Amino acid sequence: FKSAMKEYYAKAGLPTARWHIVEGLEDALDFAHTVGYPVVVKPDNGVGANNTYKLSSDEDLEFFMDHKGDEVYIMEEYVRGYVQTFDAIVDSKGQPLFESGNITPESIMDIVNDNRDSTYYLVKDVPENIRSAGLRTVKAFGVKSRFIHLEFFVLSEDQAGLGKKGDVLGLEVNMRPAGGYTPDMYNYSQETDVYKIWADMVCFDKNTKPIGAHHYCAFYGRRDGTHYKLDDYEIMMKYAGHIVMNGRIPDALSGAMANQMYVGRFDTEAEMNAFYHDLAEHF
């Protein structure tokens, strides 16, 4: 449960957004008025951005309460920042055998609810502040012998009660690899094989697979029905030396990942940003 994760983040010395388990309209309104709008509501026991909403007024909250059904929801104050992760395969002592992480520039909640294009990328190297937060979280949760995908907020501005710009907050833990095509992106990003590393962890409690040079690995998902300036052929020609995956996204994943995906590998952030710009341009 998302609410149960909060105490373990506290053990790791990481703040989290203020939260409340929604019971009725009156208590939900009290919490929203205490922290201020917008607030975010999501199932306390759920995956990804399914049934996750940003509420900006009493009217939004009343509409949500009228339609939420019997599911238990957690309500949190809205955090002004972006999501960065610490992903790893850890051994029986909780020590990483492989490390990576991604940045999601836009909220997955907004991508799903507003039907936006989908973007995220694997960083070339995990920043020390995220690595430190990740390792402390691993210790607090007592994680051993598994793949992990730990999510953190990085504040994009000072926020009263939470911290200063650049501070790291706990968001959610996932005792699994990141979803979608990310496991393959790990391999492209570090010229390795995380499937082999995971098997080595299970069988030998160590890694026997070398890890190569590090790169940025960028995902871009386009939506059907949008008229983009560059078509599929033009993208494939322009980025032939960089694109490592492309194709249709299964409909079951299209809410968060869009319909047509391109994954590119780059040595510099500037190259990656140019790739994003070219794929995003539309009429």
Predicted features, each with a name:
Residues 1-81, 91-96, 118-132, 277-281:
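Active-site nucleotide/adenylate-binding loops and adjacent lid/helix of ATP-dependent enzymes
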Residues 14, 141-143, 239-241:
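Short secondary-structure junctions
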Residues 43-45, 111-112, 253-257:
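Short, flexible turn/loop "capping" segments at secondary-structure junctions
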Residues 68-72, 78-120, 127-169, 174-182, ...:
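Phosphate-binding core of ATP-grasp and ATP-grasp-like enzymes
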Residues 51-52, 182-185:
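A short secondary-structure junction signal
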Residues 184-200:
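Gly/Ser/Thr-rich active-site loops/lids in small-molecule metabolic enzymes
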Residues 197-283:
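Peripheral (often C-terminal) accessory segments that flank ATP-dependent C-N-forming ligase machineries
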Residues 48-49, 81-83, 214, 256:
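Short acidic/glycine-enriched loop/turn segments that link adjacent beta-strands
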